[in-house]
Amino acid sequence: MTIKNQIKNFISYGFHKYLGMTVTEYMNSVSVNVIQPEKYQGIFDYPFFVETRIPIEEQIKLLGIDDYVNAANLTHLNEQINFPYVAWTHDLSLHAGKTISETYSSYLEIETGCTAIEVIAFAVHYPSLCKGRGIDAPSTIFRGEYFACLIAHEENYELASHWIDDRTENFYCLTRGKEVTK
């Protein structure tokens, strides 16, 4: 899905209205022209648009996601980016079969774990890759050794938690390249 279509996807959920913008104002407030960094080619080939001007708990409401962890109380390990951006990720296969802790220990130098808001954005933009799967956010802690995850059922999504060393079938860690584009 193109970045322009991803932005339109968020518009369809009313993100522009939440920000007090018209559709045109919202479209003009973000960049749709992004170029994949050469070092990401073949590793992080999926661009995804992340909206950070709306708090995660409000995005969850707009998107109709069931919140079983109280998103407002999550702890993010990555520095929070305070502008909308495009990040580059994979199709969930990069760390297939690994626990969250195993994923940490196998990060590439150019890689970081996704936060819950990034996992949500990825799932909204690439639903066909996510349906029937659990997607771990290895940079967002729920409590102790439990991390935020998004479970993508056929008809709905739920924000839940997943233990750092659990190897549940059909759970995947989402990571991305460290660089993002404003």
PLM features: what roles do these ranges have?
Residues M1-T112, A116-K182:
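A binding-site-centric feature that preferentially detects glycan-recognition modules on secreted/surface proteins
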